[in-house]
């Protein structure tokens, strides 16, 4: 008797990028697997818009580029293509070799947390992001309550490995809390980020 195993198809990065051009939805790519991204709630999208507006206006005239959730990021150590909810790059923007639509040198990354993705954003995705040498600061924005988590890279690694760096963790929960974004020398107020958000 022959048993047929239905193993998931393994895609090359080139196959993924080709499929992504013609896809109606955005997909992540992780080490051969294509992962459809779920649509966001209105609150999720409002928070992405508010955060990126605060970043864009705060950094006008400075040598940074601000990107929203449609900008693809390449993480070579994990063979990972993803679309962060927010991203700041110190100019010049570096593109993946042979691509005009995929960046590789973020300074600050942000994700808006949902019940289905918060563990992934805090753990696996953060671990992948930490392998990028330019990455300095990570923001996790809660969409169910007034709450933001900040991770800031500290000093030089002890062993020379990018994975051996220490990260400073801070939480913000009050409207008047000032979030100091040290990687880009910008301060934003938590209440401004959540100004038009209704949690009901």
What is each PLM-predicted segment?
Residues 1-200:
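Gly/Pro/Ser/Thr-rich low-complexity, intrinsically disordered segments predominantly at protein N-termini
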